[in-house]
Amino acid sequence: MENNNKNYSHYLHSGYAHPITRSWQGDKVILKSQLIYPIFVTDLINTKTEIKSLPGQYQISSDLVVEFLRPLVEKGLKSIILFGVIISGVKDEQASSADKRESSPVIKSIELIKNEFPEILICTDLCLCAYTDHGHCGVLTEEGFIENEKSIIRLGEIALSFAKAGAHVIAPSDMMDCRVGQIKKVLFQNGYGGRVAVMAYSSKFASSYYGPFRDAAGSGAKHGDRQAYQLPIASRGLGLRAALRDEAEGADFIMVKPAGPYMDIIREVKDHVKVPVCCYQVSGEYAMIYHASVAGGIDLKSGVMESLISLQRSGCDIFITYFTPQLLDWLKL
């Protein structure tokens, strides 16, 4: 006689046997509007150079950035984040090249992009490391230590320059204490508080996955490292504390960086903050997936999509990824 005492709730296959019912099992689909593409803009002229450690990514002079973006905009690109790269200009202790129009590739690029593609959301990375002669993310004391208060004042000045040029989102990546509050104060004092958002690199860890990026941005520290201000990789508590602090100081968006190895932090942050959470799939993550596909270890599209769906499942709302050009081809909406 057949046993009718089965617990049918343990049988799962029927709930995802059809493509449509499979789609119902996920919370969301990833949209093109959730993607932010990182762009490295240089102070050179008429130059586009592939970054060896980031295949398929380029350092682009600001005069070429519009034509570089045009085919991506036609495919549905909605958002970018600009990183300045000083090659021919001067780097100094105060990061002077960051906010002088004649020397800042970011300011020049903002103006050009905004004029040609007014619908594009322009985010600007905000840090001193790419512009200082020592390569650290803040102003240093004579002894070589970070001077936090002077650093956040300088960051506020640069943020205001980016806002005046037309940036929509300022994204401080420096990891100075309390810089979000200083940036928000400067923006409000100058009439930009209600128009320019702050996306804080809040839970940013002192990761080994940043290597290709530092090649791209020319932002490696000349001495020491950044472990005194970027978060310890083992610390879950600091990851949450930094996010809660930045939210309390007025951050409109919170970022976790890197992404894949820190999905527990993404979930923790998502469960505690009331603002959207962004994750940065950093250069080392990109390189691993890219080279695994080149070696035949994984299918590129499947690997990229799985990585982003996993990040979304962990709580990510916005994705900064170097795979954006491919995703614009793969995603329908």
Swiss-Prot record:
EC number: 4.2.1.24
Taxonomic lineage from the root: Eukaryota, Amoebozoa, Evosea, Eumycetozoa, Dictyostelia
InterPro entries, per the entry: ALAD, ALAD_AS, Aldolase_TIM
CDD domains found in the cross-reference section: eu_ALAD_PBGS_cysteine_rich (cd04824)
Any Gene Ontology biological process: protoporphyrinogen IX biosynthetic process
Active-site residues per Swiss-Prot or TrEMBL entry: K204 (schiff-base intermediate with substrate), K257 (schiff-base intermediate with substrate)
Record keyword Zinc present: yes
Catalytic activity line of the entry: 2 5-aminolevulinate = porphobilinogen + 2 H2O + H(+)
Binding site for 5-aminolevulinate 2: S283, Y322
Protein name: Delta-aminolevulinic acid dehydratase
List of residues binding Zn(2+): C127, C129, C137
Pathway the protein contributes to: Porphyrin-containing compound metabolism; protoporphyrin-IX biosynthesis; coproporphyrinogen-III from 5-aminolevulinate: step 1/4
Cofactor remark from the record: Binds 1 zinc ion per monomer.
Amino-acid positions noted as binding 5-aminolevulinate 1 in the UniProt annotation, renumbered to this chain: R214, R226
A matching Pfam family: ALAD
GO CC terms in record: cytosol
Molecular-function annotations in GO: porphobilinogen synthase activity; zinc ion binding
Assembly, per entry: Homooctamer.
Keywords: Heme biosynthesis, Lyase, Metal-binding, Porphyrin biosynthesis, Zinc
